[in-house]
Amino acid sequence: RLAPRMPSATKGNKPLNLTEKELKKNYYTVASPWEEVSLKDKMPYLQKLNDRIFALDKRVHKVQASQSDTTSHIFFCNSEGVMFYDYRPMVTLGAVCIMEEDGKTENGYAARAYRRGFDFLSDEVVDVIAREAVDQTSLLFKAIKPKGGEMPVVMGAGGSGILLHEAIGHTFEADFNRKNVSIFADQLNKKVCNEHINVVDDGTIPFNRGSVNFDDEGAEGQKTYLIKDGVLTSYLHDRISAKHYGVEPTGNGRRESFRNMPIPRMRATYMEAGNVSESDIISSVKKGIFVDNFTNGQVQIGAGDFTFFVKSGYMIEDGKLTQ
């Protein structure tokens, strides 16, 4: 019922000439679509993941292996005559590993998620996830409860990205800044951190779960520097906020569904590597904490306050990782 009315749904009821937007680069080509894959095809990989984790450590008591996949068919057109179609796959393979030792129980989780098809599932991926889940769980049996207090925190690459995402990334989303909710609402083009820090939001990493060929308003996925050399250089924009600030959209417009208005949200947000090695950073700390992984975070973007639970990490003493 909607389609016949779309060509005349513009001001003055003038016919609308729809022009399909050219796909310059596909960041998630799919060789084996999930629509062509049966449950019978997927089950062996779950069984392999389950068996592999049990085989790696005799303390394993229980395994919860899971796999999910979705396919979104996005058809978009607007009153400016822009039209595009995007095929967006998503797959996640993960496992919870539960171990018991001397009456004590610990659990760990490992997973991988990409915009890939059935070809993503492989023995190599199963092995990586299994080893990571077992290693993470095994490490917790050696964990101690450190003394409380204020001390430096060194964040390891990868797992600590949740802190960057929650504590910093959301504060750069332009709707919060446009409404003066974010602590960074008046900090654009000002120095906000150390000059060696560069923070990026990237929607163009091949097969990354945050990547998009086009966002939900038709803007192309792109790489945006939020912080460059310590200076806040850009917010994450949808079309409304881009017009408000007099800039171009950054490819971050996202809708929960076609029933919802778009809002600017992150793609893949990360801090670029610097010139200082991890070992040099650790050796510079007299007493502190090195964090592998965070969990259970709470953030107040207006106040800039955040709290996270350290899932796994080490004490730093005299510039060395100890326990």
Predicted regions: what is each one?
Residues 187-323:
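Dual-mode signal for accessory low-complexity, basic/Gly-rich regions
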Residues 1-222, 228-231, 320:
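Active-site bordering "gate/hinge" segments
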